[in-house]
Amino acid sequence: MPTIQQLIRQERELLKRKTKSPALKGCPQRRGVCTRVYTTTPKKPNSALRKVARVRLTSGFEVTAYIPGIGHNLQEHSVVMIRGGRVKDLPGVRYHIIRGTLDTAGVKDRKQGRSKYGAKRPKPGEAAATGKKK
């Protein structure tokens, strides 16, 4: 344990926190271009075909980003916006593509949690047309 005199001479060094999303370089979102759009399988207890894209960012990084929601219109050379946020059952996927911005279309027919998927508010007449009631 250092003495008070030693602490006066040289204060304690603060521990540096390692970022979970280094490719964003401290920004909330980053723009990038899809270099490859494909599906991959999740870790052990789960089973699915998860939609992911390899994205070349403006920060110079190339990262793997998850495409949330049902259905998407992304292909190679699509310009996308990504945010931080990992996918627990996909190793190496630490970013999410933001739906409804740039070349990424919002999720069609989304009624709840629309803001997370870039879906517009349905018109009052459309709710009755689908035959769904609360």
From Swiss-Prot:
Keywords: Methylation, Ribonucleoprotein, Ribosomal protein, RNA-binding, rRNA-binding, tRNA-binding. The modification 3-methylthioaspartic acid is found at residue 89. Residues 113-122 have a biased composition (Basic residues). The keyword Transmembrane does not apply. One of its GO terms (molecular function) is tRNA binding. InterPro entries: NA-bd_OB-fold, Ribosomal_uS12, Ribosomal_uS12_bac. One of its GO terms (biological process) is translation. Residues 103-134 are annotated as: Disordered. It holds the Pfam family Ribosom_S12_S23. GO terms for cellular component: small ribosomal subunit. Gene3D superfamilies: Nucleic acid-binding proteins (2.40.50.140). With S4 and S5 plays an important role in translational accuracy. Interacts with and stabilizes bases of the 16S rRNA that are involved in tRNA selection in the A site and with the mRNA backbone. Located at the interface of the 30S and 50S subunits, it traverses the body of the 30S subunit contacting proteins on the other side and probably holding the rRNA structure together. The combined cluster of proteins S8, S12 and S17 appears to hold together the shoulder and platform of the 30S subunit. HAMAP family: Ribosomal_uS12_B (MF_00403_B). Part of the 30S ribosomal subunit. Contacts proteins S8 and S17. May interact with IF1 in the 30S initiation complex. Belongs to the universal ribosomal protein uS12 family. This is Small ribosomal subunit protein uS12. The lineage of its organism: Bacteria, Bacillati, Cyanobacteriota, Cyanophyceae, Acaryochloridales. The gene is rpsL.
